[in-house]
């Protein structure tokens, strides 16, 4: 027998020691088996993917492709699922793996987003690094219950005379802006955002399907007016996948809801929902959903209604915050009776219609007062507006009809001519340059002057200069009254007389100044 061979006792001791060491090592490991459900891509199209092998996947669940590319489950059939991609699909092909995540899509929210330009997933587009958001909220959330809502009671001042006086918007309201291309829809939005600089309103601008150059111009304007500190800009460009365009307005709404739940006032602008509807139509047709009117799927009304219903004013017990929604719609050939415009008109609390006819005449902003309405905001107007412009909407509409009638060459009596001249001056006063939102006192002074006849003796081409002189005089001479108007105090009879006296003095002083200059 070989003496070098270990004895049975030694071998047993060695094995016991080895297994003991192995047990000690294994006991220190917390290895857990992780179940991953992985399927296979069967088809890749323009912004959509079909896959199989995911029997337990849920609708609207987030899935991951190779390279951490993301998708959202849209269709769930017996043998395959339809996925909308949130990234470009160049790196996805038939046979690629697709993995479940077990969670729904969410977006970053919080103060860290202010001043940033992001895509709908919360990824930065401004080259300023990742967003350090402390929380994330789901893309889709239930709208507040009826008993959680409070009446809309506080005005949202746009700084635009014709809107604040005739088509007022309240905080928590949904007001649609619609009109043809190049009629000034985005210009109204920019002025509204600029006017919130001292109003404690957080503004979220959501660009959907717009050209990158157009969005860059919007960002540049907001930067130049130093509005970005209270703004969030969410961008899904026209060259982005349609899936990213589809989720963009929902992402912007979730970002706004975070602040609303904390008692803050939020303004969310969707620019525009026409492109959003087209992106949804494209995805639905590619995924073979049954088309309806104008090839839109049957739930096109629902996808906008469920989003805009999240805009509201909460009860004080829930913080008293508000989310005001201003969707934009692009019409074709001034047709506001098309499918998507009529859907949005029926969902929202009013609409502001921009007329290409007025735009071509140089009447800016080109708001058609007769076709515009605010079903909620009128109750929120500051008392001073109701005092000076209570019947202005009716009288202005009558003036427009009278002006149309007078073009037929009918002989007019003195009273009719006087109404026409007054109406033309009202129209001149309601004109306003872009990027020049006015404070409440400036608007009240101008409106009171024109409705009381203080500008009847001024030629139309000099109305703008006279308005500026009146506003300067009111700020210099009546600063206390301006502060009271801003606070929402009503105008007394004495206040009206004081304002009118200052306006008439400012108007009368101009010819004297010219005479002094000429001499």
Curated annotation (Swiss-Prot):
SUPFAM superfamilies named among the record's database cross-references: C-terminal domain of alpha and beta subunits of F1 ATP synthase (SSF47917), N-terminal domain of alpha and beta subunits of F1 ATP synthase (SSF50615), P-loop containing nucleoside triphosphate hydrolases (SSF52540)
Subcellular location: Cell inner membrane
Recorded topology in the membrane: Peripheral membrane protein
InterPro entries: Alt_ATP_synth_F1_asu, ATP_synth_asu-like_sf, ATP_synth_asu_C, ATP_synth_asu_C_sf, ATP_synth_F1_a_nt-bd_dom, ATP_synth_F1_asu, ATPase_a/bsu_AS, ATPase_F1/V1/A1_a/bsu_N
GO CC entries: plasma membrane; proton-transporting ATP synthase complex
Enzyme Commission numbers on file: 7.1.2.2
Catalytic reactions on record: ATP + H2O + 4 H(+)(in) = ADP + phosphate + 5 H(+)(out)
Role noted for this protein: Produces ATP from ADP in the presence of a proton gradient across the membrane. The alpha chain is a regulatory subunit.
PANTHER family named among the record's database cross-references: ATP SYNTHASE SUBUNIT ALPHA, MITOCHONDRIAL
Quaternary structure and partners: F-type ATPases have 2 components, CF(1) - the catalytic core - and CF(0) - the membrane proton channel. CF(1) has five subunits: alpha(3), beta(3), gamma(1), delta(1), epsilon(1). CF(0) has three main subunits: a(1), b(2) and c(9-12). The alpha and beta chains form an alternating ring which encloses part of the gamma chain. CF(1) is attached to CF(0) by a central stalk formed by the gamma and epsilon chains, while a peripheral stalk is formed by the delta and b chains.
Protein's recorded name: ATP synthase subunit alpha 2
Lineage: Bacteria, Pseudomonadati, Thermodesulfobacteriota, Syntrophia, Syntrophales
């Amino acid at each position: 027998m070989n003496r070098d061979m270990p004895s049975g006792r030694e071998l047993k001791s060695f094995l016991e020691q080895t297994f003991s060491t192995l047990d000690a090592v294994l006991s220190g490991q917390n290895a857990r088996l992780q179940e991953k459900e992985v399927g296979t891509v069967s088809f890749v199209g323009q912004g959509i993917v079909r896959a199989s092998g995911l029997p337990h996947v849920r609708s609207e669940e987030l899935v991951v492709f190779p390279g951490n590319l993301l998708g959202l489950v849209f269709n769930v059939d017996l043998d395959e699922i339809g996925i909308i991609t949130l990234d470009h699909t160049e790196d996805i092909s038939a046979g690629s793996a697709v993995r479940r995540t077990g969670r729904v899509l969410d977006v970053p929210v919080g103060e860290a987003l202010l001043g940033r330009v992001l895509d709908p997933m919360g990824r930065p587009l401004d080259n300023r690094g990742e967003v350090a958001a402390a929380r994330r909220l789901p893309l889709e959330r239930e709208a507040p219950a009826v008993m959680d809502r409070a009446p809309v009671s506080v005005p949202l001042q746009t700084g635009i005379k014709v809107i604040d006086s005739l088509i007022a918007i309240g905080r928590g309201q949904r007001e649609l802006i619609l009109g043809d291309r190049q009629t000034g829809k985005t210009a109204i939005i920019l002025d509204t955002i600029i006017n919130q600089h001292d109003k404690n309103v957080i503004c979220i601008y959501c660009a959907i399907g717009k050209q990158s150059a157009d969005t860059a111009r919007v960002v540049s304007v907001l930067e130049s007016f130093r509005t970005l500190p209270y703004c969030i800009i969410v961008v899904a460009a026209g060259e982005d996948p349609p899936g990213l365009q589809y989720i963009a307005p929902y992402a912007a709404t979730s970002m706004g809801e975070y602040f609303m739940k904390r008692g803050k006032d939020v303004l969310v602008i969707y620019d525009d929902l026409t492109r959003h509807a087209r992106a949804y139509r494209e995805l639905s047709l590619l995924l073979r959903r049954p088309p309806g009117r104008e090839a839109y799927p049957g739930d096109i009304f629902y996808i906008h209604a469920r989003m805009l219903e999240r805009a509201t004013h909460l009860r004080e017990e829930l913080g008293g915050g508000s989310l005001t929604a201003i969707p934009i719609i692009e019409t074709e050939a001034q047709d506001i009776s098309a499918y998507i415009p009529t859907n949005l008109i029926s969902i929202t609390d009013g609409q502001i219609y921009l007329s290409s006819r007025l735009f071509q005449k140089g009447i800016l902003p080109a708001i058609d007062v007769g076709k515009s309405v605010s079903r909620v905001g009128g109750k929120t107007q500051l008392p001073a507006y109701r005092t000076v412009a209570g019947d202005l909407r009716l009288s202005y509409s009558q003036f427009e009809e009278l002006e149309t009638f007078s073009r037929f060459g009918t002989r007019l009596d003195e009273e009719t001519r006087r109404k026409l001249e007054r109406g033309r001056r009202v129209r001149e006063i309601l004109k306003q340059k872009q990027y020049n939102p006015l404070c409440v006192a400036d608007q009240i002074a101008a409106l009171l002057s024109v409705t009381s006849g203080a500008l009847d003796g001024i030629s139309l081409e000099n109305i703008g200069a006279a308005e500026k002189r009146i506003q300067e005089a009111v700020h210099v001479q009546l600063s206390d009254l301006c502060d009271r108007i801003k606070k929402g105090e009503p105008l007394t009879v004495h206040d009206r007389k004081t304002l009118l006296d200052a306006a008439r003095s400012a108007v009368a002083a101009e010819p004297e100044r010219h005479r002094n200059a000429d001499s």
